[in-house]
Structures are given as C-alpha cells and as structure tokens.
A protein has these predicted regions:
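Extracytoplasmic substrate-binding proteins
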Residues: 6, 27-28, 37-119, 143, ...
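C-terminal soluble interaction/assembly domains
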Residues: 142-143, 148-240, 244-249
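Short amphipathic alpha-helical segments and helix-helix/interface helices
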Residues: 18, 41-43, 73, 130, ...
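Extracytoplasmic
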Residues: 5, 16, 105-107, 193-195
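Flexible, glycine-rich surface segments
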Residues: 92, 97-182
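Short, structured coil segments at secondary-structure junctions
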Residues: 48-49, 136-137, 194
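Alpha-helical segments with a strong preference for the paired helices of cellulosomal dockerin domains
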Residues: 15-23, 43-47, 177-187
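A short, structured surface patch at a secondary-structure boundary
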Residues: 1-24, 28-35
Length: 249
C-alpha cells in the first residue's frame, strides 16, 4: 500500500499535519514515545476526538515480551486467535533454541556497537539485546551497567572491551571491515576483526532502506536467536543461514 501511494505521510513526532490527519478520519492512531507521553500530540488528538494508543515495545527487556506486542496488531485486525497461535509458535521455537545452548561450556564474549563522536554507548546488561546474547550462549563484555538504559563509555575503555571480545556485533553503518577500521586504525588489531568475527544486523533491508532487524525482528525473536546461536558458536552455517546478520569482509 505504501508503494501504491495509499499510505499517507502525516509527519513525525510533534510535526504532525493535524489537518490532514483529521481529514483522514482514522479509527485509531498508534503513537511511539521513547521519552514518555507527548502531550502536544495527545492533547491535539483528544481535541480532535481521535483515539490513540501508545506502542511500548521499546521498553520490553524480554525478547518474548517484545514479541507479545504483535497481539496489539492481532486485536486491531480482529485476528486474536491467529495472533495467539503465531505467538505460541514463536515462543516454542525460541525456548527450544535456547535449550540447545543452555548448558554449553563455550560462552563467546560479545562486544556491541561502534563509537559516536568518540563516545561508545553500551547497553544495560538487562536490555533486550543482552538477553538475546545470553540466551544464545554468549557473554556480554560490559557488566558494569544494570540500569534501564545505555551508558556512555569513553573510546579508550571501549577499545579495551573490544580487545576482550570474541565476537563484535551491531557495528552501525559499517558494511565491510575496511569501513570499520577506517573509523579507528587500531580496530584492525582487535581479535574479532582479525578472526573475521564481526557481524552486522543489516542483512535484510526494508523497502524504505532501513534494517529489518528493527522491524520484523522485533516480533521474530526466534529468528534473531537462531542467527546469534549460529554466529556465536561458529558452526559453519551462519554465512548462509542467517536471516538478519551478515559477516563483515
């Protein structure tokens, strides 16, 4: 529908075209607010008599908890039973995959992300991504943060953490090892780079050019977990079987 032009662009954040939105007469508006309620938007929607719901999948720390938000779409589309059945299948496969590596002795250490203006943001050890890594039989290199958000780490400390990692994931816009080491020549000496164990979560692209990891991957943690198990334990199938991840060459 987007390609056919039947999905209208009404703006972003507080810059919404409320006149266009009102003319469309929506039954419901779905809102996404990382920093809490946007009272400018919600106040105007109430004034116009337009119902709204906040989608809060981003606050979920559990991969399966995040996937449960597919039930919102199922309810809105009058597909409750189909949604519940899909969610059960996802949960069953996720738990089966986790059980495969639950007792493995090898726990590869994992580094995440790349620097932004000389600052490295390291996720909380309670976060969604770290839960996935642990369920895949990996170990996060940064254990000093158990808050509810990422923390800034200076580039030198992050470089030392990267040197302690077996695998490096989610490297931003980098598509090759050359692009990664261009950010900092010292990255070439990091074990994960030398051993070609750097992976990015941008194998699948959306029609708009974004990473599908942050779209369909949100409600398919079983697929994400399968990717992570394959690449963390280097079973030889990851390059061909991964859905969301690709190895940097």
């Amino acid at each position: 529908r987007r390609a056919a032009g039947t999905v209208r662009d009404v703006g972003y954040d507080t810059n919404l075209d409320f006149e266009l939105l009102a003319a469309m007469q929506p039954d419901l508006v779905l809102l996404y607010g990382i920093s809490g309620e946007n009272t400018i938007v919600t106040g105007k929607l109430r004034e116009l008599g337009i119902p709204y719901i906040y989608v809060g999948d981003y606050v979920e720390e559990s991969p399966l908890g995040k996937a449960e938000w597919l039930m919102l779409a199922a309810e809105l589309c009058d597909r409750r039973d189909a949604g519940a059945d899909t969610l059960r299948q996802i949960a069953t496969r996720y738990e089966a995959l986790r059980a495969q590596v639950d007792t493995t002795a090898a726990r590869p250490r994992v580094m995440l992300n790349t620097p932004y203006r000389d600052t490295w943001f390291m996720p909380s050890s309670r976060s969604y991504m770290i839960r996935l890594i642990e369920d895949a039989g990996g170990e996060y290199v940064y254990t000093q943060n158990d808050s509810s958000s990422s923390v800034a780490v200076d580039a030198e400390e992050a470089y030392l953490l990267a040197n302690d990692a077996d695998v490096w994931l989610n490297v931003g816009a980098c598509n090759t090892l050359g692009e990664l080491t261009a950010q900092n020549p010292r990255f070439a000496a990091v074990p994960a780079v030398r051993n070609r164990r750097v992976w990015n979560n941008n194998r699948r692209q959306t029609p708009a050019g974004g990473s599908d990891f942050w779209e369909s991957g949100v409600v398919r943690p079983d697929r994400v977990l399968a990717d992570l198990i394959a690449l963390l334990h280097d079973d030889g199938t990851a390059d061909s079987c991964c859905c969301y991840y690709k190895r940097l060459e």
